[in-house]
Amino acid sequence: MLAIAVTVSAVTAFAVSPTRRSFAIVTEPQTFKHCSAELEKYREAVCTDGLDAFICVNDWSCPDELRDSLKTYYRNRSLAGAVFVGDVPIAMIRKAQHLTSAFKMDEDGAFPMRESSVPSDRFYDDFDLKFDYVCRDTSETNFFYYNLAPESPQYISCDIYTGRIKPSVKRGDPYGEISRYLLKAAAAKSGRNPLDHLVSYSGSGSFSNSLAAWKDETITLKEQMPAAFSSSDGAKFYVFAMYPNMKDILLKEIARDELDLVLFHEHGVPERQYLTDIPEPEDIDGYYTDARYRLRRQLRTAAGRGQDTEALKAEYIKKYGIPSAWLEDWDDPKYEVEDSLYDAATGIMLDDVVKTAPNVRMAIFDACYNGDFREDDCIASRYVLSDGKALVGIGNSVNVLQDKSSSDLLGMLALGYSAGEWMQQVNILESHILGDPTFHFTAPEGAAKPDLYSTDINYWKKYTDAKYPCDIRGLALQKLFTLDAPGLSDLLMKTWKSSDEYMLRLQCMHLLAHYNDGNYSKLLKDGADDPYEFIRRKSTFYLGKVGEDWMADELAAVYMRDYNSLRVAANVGFVCAHFADSLFLKNFDRRLEEAAWVYDKDSFREKAMATFSLACSIESGTGKIFTDKNARGKNFYISGMRNNPYPQYAMPLLSLVKDNSESTALRTECAEVLGWFVRYHGRRELISAITDYLESGTSMPREVRDELVKTKGRLEYYTR
């Protein structure tokens, strides 16, 4: 261990006052050897900014060693956060997919461990989580695999915040990248920079391309960052269809010196941001060019899969009535180059970022895999490690839910809280800071900035007053939730009814889901007719997950009045089958019959059934596995209940868990799937039934018992 827990200057990091928090700059010997001067400059800047920073150098043998050190600093040195610089071990988490927003991949052999695990620094910043070590990767030896332990808390509540500064080795200058970044991060701490310029972009495919879903962000961001709305160029909102070439516009935007924050809502992979589809043709020549391009692309894809391209060409000629000349050049290298450029115009790639040298200080990537730091390089890292003034990238290490709120408590940034302090409140398993987690914008003079470390319930109740900004009130409600404040359910309901602030009311919705006292169901009924589309969308979705009988009629009413809001209508379709005996369809048919304003009822129903039919078909197939022991597709339907936890099948699913005639693998999977019933209206009874079974003395396989213990913990977190 080299210089662990000490600084490399004459100033010792052990002199930490009780009111002054510390910050660990964690690295390994090679990075320290090449970047020691820059690490020290960064440390000094962090100290000047208000934290007692220290450099921690070690040849880390495994993540547990580092985690134990961080725990010690947290107990003894008031550790606030840490940044991992260089080649610091990566914890690859398994058996914890419920802590992600969307990631679901078979962990039992169908996929490699590398792909079916989640790279996550929650291993380092949430000390209450418990893990069982699995193994070390034999080829990428900095990867260490862990299962979330059955006895662990089944939710995330970070004790500290973390970030990563991880360079690309393949680009040839990893230590230079680190050194240059540390110097610019240090320099940035000496200036004033309020958050008063932002850009938001929604890419093709985000929110089903629904303008009803897109438009409300102008309201929510104004609630959270009002200073950005005080000038003509302070807040800009783009959507993929605005201009023919959005890529050029966005590259110019992120290069603006005054830009503080950009939010990307898009699809992504580690090396690319998907911005748009191929632009719509504007004339006959454009349609001709576009058609040939698409056919060439399909043929190349088919060739890559080993398919018969000659047979496929003949099929296209017959199907579309086109001449063979349209297809003769599909494998011409000249057209391959041209087509690659055509495709490149639809996204931002790593090299585009390098050439642009972004100056936007913070970029939030509400996208899949843009923050996947297990790879040599990723979009979020490349933004901050390029030559511009970019300092922080917030990205996800795996895929992420499209219908996820990505701006909860985001107003904390405008009030001077650091990127790490904000993310500590909203982290999920896959979300990460790439860059300096201590970076913060300059707070407005006189801004309210409560002490995040207070555990005084009365202190936080004070900040629920309407005179405070919406995200300070939202933060206070979250702190009261963490402290298990008495009467919080009623306070959340009161705030929900009295506030007209979208983001504060959304926070009430998030937190009230954990109470099983009837208030949440009332909120969902109100929320299904809310002016904020996201609240309508999620209320619709959760009405099905709760699954009380009266909610079937409420969902039918939602569809009838809001079917033109594409994401709302889609969410009705997702959950319309979460009721027994086709209850939703019966209510829908009745409401349609009573709707005098619908001129052509047959056409209306036909279009609606296109939204409902798939869900109804899957539910029907699922039901058969409980009545027919030899039903086909049993594993498919059981696995599908992770996305579709049908309330009507909760107790039958537990019966399968108890059935000794079923295989251990199937019983274990059923036990795990029950953990997705966190909003089920009968979850208290479900918890009681699980507890009775666990305590009955009945013999059961260890795998089944472990999964039931985990499921019970998951359900209890939503049953205050």
Cite the ranges covered by each PLM segment:
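Bacterial Sec-dependent N-terminal signal peptides
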Residues: 1-18
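Loop/turn elements at helix/coil->beta-strand transitions in domains of secreted/extracellular proteins
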Residues: 19-23, 48-53, 77-81, 192-198, ...
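Structured catalytic cores of large enzymes
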Residues: 64-244, 253-261, 270, 276-283
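Catalytic cores of nucleophile-dependent amide-cleaving enzymes
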Residues: 117-180, 289-405
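Caspase-like cysteine protease fold
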Residues: 406-494, 498-510
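Amphipathic alpha-helical scaffolding segments comprising HEAT/armadillo-like alpha-solenoid repeats
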Residues: 453-464, 485-497, 517-528, 548-560, ...
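Short inter-helical turns and helix N-cap capping residues of alpha-solenoid HEAT/ARM repeat scaffolds
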Residues: 468-469, 500-501, 531-532, 562-565, ...
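Structural detector for internal amphipathic alpha-helices that build alpha-solenoid repeat scaffolds
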Residues: 471-483, 503-515, 536-548, 567-582, ...
